[in-house]
Amino acid sequence: MSDNDELQQIAHLRREYTKGGLRRQDLPAEPLDLFERWLKQACEAKLADPTAMVVATVDENSQPYQRIVLLKHYDEKGLVFYTNLGSRKAHHLENNPRISLLFPWHMLERQVMVTGKAERLSTLEVLKYFHSRPRDSQIGAWVSKQSSRISARGVLESKFLELKQKFQQGEVPLPSFWGGFRVSVEQMEFWQGGEHRLHDRFLYQRDNAAWKIDRLAP
């Protein structure tokens, strides 16, 4: 068998999903309540990076891009993450605030998909979170001009040591190019794997002040 033939065997990689179902009678009226329950269970199951989410944005040519970012806060106003404001995703969101998030909790056979709009956080919100980060992470935020091309990793490491020396006294200041976004939820879909590929999917869609809930075919 050639290497190419071996690679083609991925078509046969599959497993049954047997960890349980999701039924309408178990659904709360608010999607954030179910999200919180599932996130807590993901943390209790000791999944690697349970707050990791795929963030999808589009550029001015409608070309989609994805990357993994950590969720840092959520409440009834939305889901929050932080980033370099010079990054590609930040530029995308300045031009088009439409955004999609995905939480892939594979070990629990679950996914949560979110669509909505992103808006910049206030400087006060960003400052409060920034100073809660480990000091080296604060310095690291100063080092990288995110998404720019660099010649070698050594450039970053040298800059980090330089700034660590510079900021050795007192607080590390908040970079003007570092901030965050809040995603206001318009839709939230919960996916639970099921046997024979008969997965359970429920879509919460905002309907004025309430939420409309629909079961979707897998």
From Swiss-Prot:
Domain of life, per lineage: Bacteria
Entry cofactor note text?
Answer: Binds 1 FMN per subunit.
Q: What is its EC number?
A: 1.4.3.5
Which sites bind substrate? 14-17, 72, 129, 133, 137, 197-199
Show the catalytic activity: pyridoxamine 5'-phosphate + O2 + H2O = pyridoxal 5'-phosphate + H2O2 + NH4(+); pyridoxine 5'-phosphate + O2 = pyridoxal 5'-phosphate + H2O2
How it assembles, according to the record, is: Homodimer.
- Annotated protein name in UniProt: Pyridoxine/pyridoxamine 5'-phosphate oxidase
